[in-house]
A protein has these predicted regions:
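Walker A/P-loop
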Residues: 1-12
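Conserved helicase motor "Helicase C" RecA-like lobe of SF1/SF2 P-loop NTPases
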Residues: 225-252
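Conserved helix/coil segment N-terminal to the catalytic DExD/H
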Residues: 69-109, 291
Length: 341
């Protein structure tokens, strides 16, 4: 959400890497795209005081990266024992157990980013393991998930998640100028009729909103991958966007990343997304289902448009994509909500 959670981790890593004894840091993210983004943001900083010459990096997930990447416990163990430097491991909640399975990796500090994901039953075993056995363990989220029953894990379980060290309300971040206030706009649309395909109605809904709000950089949250594919392949949506001066990109776990009709790897997608976000003259639309909701930092993103229902955490995370500060002309994050007239 732009509150500075990542910088808290980075500054702590800098303090850890001042030690003459090699330290092992693990950074956990909910998605591969965010793990790669965190790696980029960490290594932009001078972590070890020697421009990261004394730092080894490994990714433990199935995604693409320039760094050594593996999900095999034996390979992790071999790489770990061959390193004589400070170590940072970037992984996902899905793959964290792969590090746990090595048994040899002694974790000095572990950071759980978007840690509301940690309470999921298929992740909690590995999370609890490192809560006990890592020397230092920290959880970061803008949307904590609590439980009122002892039969379901929540972040209010102090035995696993500890006590709250710092809690900064969003209004305080807005007041102090770290993030922008959100602005909700209701866009009334006609009820769909049986004479037209659903994707034609979706096209009109999106284009009417774009025309009405006149924003340059828009995130569209679709109901499903199928809705996105139908919109860009079966309707005139892409042609209509181009005629308005917009580029387009989409990313889902099923289709991968696409920029202006060309399939690209996730790293190129992420780099292009940030490059376009920084370019004040660039107009573009990003379509996704949920992959960009959590933690992804896109500079300059002005508006989010909802085409589906969401739980409060996903809504809050999506709002966080557009309330980050941009240039001086951006004074709020726009949230476009279509409703039937």
């Amino acid at each position: 959400t732009g509150g500075g959670k990542t910088m808290c981790m980075i500054e702590d890593v800098k303090r850890q890497f001042k030690s003459p004894v090699s330290k092992t840091i693990v950074v956990v993210a909910p998605r591969i795209l965010l793990a790669n983004q965190l790696c980029s943001e960490f290594l932009e900083q001078n972590l070890d005081g020697n421009y990261n010459v004394g730092v080894d990096v490994i990714h433990v997930h199935s995604g693409e990266t320039h760094f050594y990447s593996t999900t095999k416990s034996d390979n992790i163990k071999k790489w770990y024992h061959n390193s004589t430097k400070h170590i940072i491991m970037f992984t996902t909640y899905h793959s964290l157990h792969k590090i746990q399975d090595t048994l040899d990796v002694e974790v000095d500090t572990i950071y759980f980013d978007e840690s509301h994901n940690a309470v999921q039953k298929n992740f909690i075993e590995a999370v609890e393991y490192y809560s006990i056995y890592a020397s230092r363990c920290y959880f970061f989220t803008a949307t904590p998930k609590h439980s009122l029953t002892p039969f379901k894990v929540g972040m209010n379980d102090a035995d696993i998640f500890g006590q709250v060290i710092c809690n900064v309300p969003a209004p305080k971040l807005v007041k102090q100028g770290y993030i922008l206030p959100p602005k909700v706009v209701i866009n009334k649309i006609d009820l769909p009729d049986d004479d037209r395909f659903a994707y034609e109605h979706d096209r009109d809904c999106v284009l009417d909103t774009i025309d009405a709000q006149d924003v340059d950089k828009i995130l569209i949250c679709a109901r499903s991958t199928k809705q996105i594919i139908n919109l860009v392949t079966h309707s005139t949506f892409v042609v209509d966007l181009i005629s308005r001066g917009y580029s387009w990109m989409m990313i889902t776990s099923k289709t991968g990343a696409v920029i202006d009709g060309k399939k690209v790897d996730r790293e190129e997608f992420f780099n292009t997304l940030n490059s376009w976000g920084k370019d004040s003259s660039k107009r573009f639309v990003v379509l996704h289902h949920s992959i960009l909701s959590e933690g992804i930092n896109v500079k300059g993103l002005e508006a989010a448009m909802f085409l589906r229902n969401m739980d409060y955490i996903t809504i809050s995370q999506t709002i966080g994509r557009v309330i980050r500060k941009g240039d001086e002309s951006k004074t709020f994050g726009l949230l476009c909500v279509p409703v039937y007239d």
